[in-house]
């Protein structure tokens, strides 16, 4: 659809495609993960060495503002993936969330094949991919034209604290 839009229209089109967005109003699986992080339970992410792209809501807003003010020849007809340049592992994300909540990481290492088998048996194979799989977006097209992402740690902390309140 994006390719068709880029070729069929006479207006200048810029496509911004954010990866998983995190922030104070996180929903669905991300919100559930925040709630789980706010328990004393040890979590099975000690061996989760995956790499996943995330982007904070703040960085999405900043990137969109940047794209709307960029010179036309730099952005027109292009697709920009919005993702912070450094992917995070689930282990790192959970550790940052627990730190923001004043909790120790309490991560146990469960081999990936065991987690995959367990989640597949309970009909949650997609959840395994989301928690243990890799998904890295190429952000070079946006950073090449001068956009600078803010570090996401403050937004991770805000998301964790907001989930605690709700």
Language-model segments: residues:
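Active-site Tyr-X1-5-Lys
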Residues: 1-14, 24, 30
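PG/GG-rich flexible active-site loop of Rossmann-like NAD(P)H-dependent oxidoreductases
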Residues: 20
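Substrate-positioning beta->alpha
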Residues: 26-32, 46-69, 77-78
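Alpha-helical membrane-targeting segments
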Residues: 32-57, 99, 104-136
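C-terminal amphipathic/interface module of NAD(P)-dependent oxidoreductases
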Residues: 106, 126-166
